[in-house]
C-alpha cells in the first residue's frame, strides 16, 4: 500500500549558512556601524546580541530574511524575549524540530475529518499516512499544505 511520512525538520546546515549571511549583512549595514552586534549558532538555537533592544528587533528581521533566502520558513522559529544584562541585550531564537503531540493530533483530526480514504498514525515525532490509491495520498498532501498548523511540514518516504 502506498504511504508517506509527514515530518517537520529544519536543516541546521542551512541555518548555519543563513546565520553567516546575516552576520555579513550586519557588517555592511550603515545603521549597525560602530555597534557590537552578532548572530551566533549554538546547536539548535541562534543567539542574537546587541547594544539596544530596537537593534535586536532589526536583527530578527535580518535573520528572517536570510532564512527565507535559504528556504526555511519563519513559522519554524521560536523567538524568545530579549534579556538585558549589563549594557548588552540578548535574545535566543529556537527552531522547531519534529511534530509535537498536540499538532500531530490536530493533523490526524484534519485528515480524518476530510473523509479522504487514508489511514493516519502518529509515530513519535512524525505522522504516517497510508492509503490504497496514490491520488488519495496526494489529496492528503494538498490538504496538509493548505492547513495552518503553526510549523512547516515536509513529506518524506513516499512509497508506492
UniProtKB/Swiss-Prot annotation:
Q: Name one GO molecular function term.
A: nucleotide binding
> Out of the domains of life, which is the source?
Bacteria
Q: Which GO terms describe its cellular component?
A: cytosol
Q: Which UniProt keywords apply?
A: Nucleotide-binding
Give the InterPro entries listed for this entry: DUF520, UPF0234-like_C, UPF0234_N, YajQ-like_sf
Q: Which Pfam families match?
A: DUF520
Q: What does this protein do?
A: Nucleotide-binding protein.
Q: Which family does it belong to?
A: Belongs to the YajQ family.
Family matches, as NCBIfam families: PRK05412.1
Query: What is the name of the protein in this document?
Result: Nucleotide-binding protein ASA_3207
Question: What organism does the record attribute this protein to?
Answer: Aeromonas salmonicida (strain A449)
